[in-house]
């Protein structure tokens, strides 16, 4: 994948929820919740500050993160699904 997000945007590969529950029940696609965890696959160069400097991002490629449920833009590249979102929509690193 060759994508370079702009400014403080981040590209994530969503980590899908388990197919089975702890009791072995298979969860159908219609009942699955939208993923809120992902792996960072690309980061922008940072947000431009008022003084002209760039604020470094707090996440890096390879980090596993939790993000807001309805944030970002879903895209498909080479048959794989990704999410582009602003760094501020990332809630925590795992």
From Swiss-Prot:
GO terms for cellular component: cytoplasm. One of its GO terms (biological process) is chaperone cofactor-dependent protein refolding. InterPro entries: Chaperonin_GroES, Chaperonin_GroES_sf, GroES-like_sf. It is found in: Cytoplasm. It comes from the Bacteria. Pfam families: Cpn10. Keywords: Chaperone, Cytoplasm. Belongs to the GroES chaperonin family. Its main location: cytoplasm. This is Co-chaperonin GroES. HAMAP family: CH10. Together with the chaperonin GroEL, plays an essential role in assisting protein folding. The GroEL-GroES system forms a nano-cage that allows encapsulation of the non-native substrate proteins and provides a physical environment optimized to promote and accelerate protein folding. GroES binds to the apical surface of the GroEL ring, thereby capping the opening of the GroEL channel. GO terms for molecular function: ATP binding; metal ion binding; protein folding chaperone; protein-folding chaperone binding; unfolded protein binding. Heptamer of 7 subunits arranged in a ring. Interacts with the chaperonin GroEL.
